[in-house]
Amino acid sequence: RDPEMSRGLGDVYKRQIVGSNGAGKSTLFNAITGGFIADEGSILLGGQDITFAPEHQRSKVIGHLFQDPLKGTAPNMTIEENLALAYLRAGTAPNAIFSRISRKDKALFREKLALLDMGLEDRMKQPVGLLSGGQRQALTLLMATLVTPKLLLLDEHTAALDPATAEKVLALTKSIVAEKKITCLMVTHNMHQALELGNRTLMMDAGRIVFDVKGAARSKMTVDDLLEKFRENAGKNLDNDRILLSKVEK
């Protein structure tokens, strides 16, 4: 319900999105990826109207990581086959790459996997189903950014991981997004992350954006300030347990 969301994606480095369950965060992402067609308004990406573009076409330019680390990979396929599939999805490689992965592509995959610092470059022939949740999420991140997307959507992509692994995957995310200068939308229930990561914070309630802050005003805000702004604009307290617990966690 906020026209600024569709107008401003192209000029933003990274936005954090906060809201309680049912606020519309996942619905927003589904509208962007083409999971359903919006009832009204339009969705622009890089100046191009993608409102009615099919989901498979949008997937070539939009990367998407889910909270569940099992959703972004094919478990019965090997690591290198998953990476080859990511190449195909982006439309940057011929179909033949999937049946016969060239030495050049294997070398590229090995190089990119080594950057994850998880030893996956030495396990390229192993099925992805044998990896841990954190390893699979890191691989999904690599697949989503192997060919730089116009937009990267992160739907609480570290929430299901243990704290140490979540921190590592988040660090990888920050590094890749910064290096490739990827426009990114990230849903989080962590209030500290909402203020510390990226350069803009949005708060949602009942399908609408109730608070939007950036720049100097954002840099001065505390978690309590953010919660108070939500109360003022939404007319109620933000009472999600995970969000409130994150007030005292860093």
Where do the PLM segments sit?
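ABC ATPase C-loop
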Residues: 144-145
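The feature captures the beta-strand-to-loop junction immediately N-terminal to the Walker
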Residues: 18-20
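Helix-to-loop junction immediately C-terminal to a conserved catalytic motif
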Residues: 33
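Single conserved hydrophobic/aromatic residue that forms the stacking wall/gate
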Residues: 2-13
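ABC ATPase nucleotide-binding domains
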Residues: 218-250
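H-loop/switch region of ABC-family ATPase nucleotide-binding domains
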Residues: 188-189
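Conserved ABC transporter NBD signature motif
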Residues: 41-49, 211-213
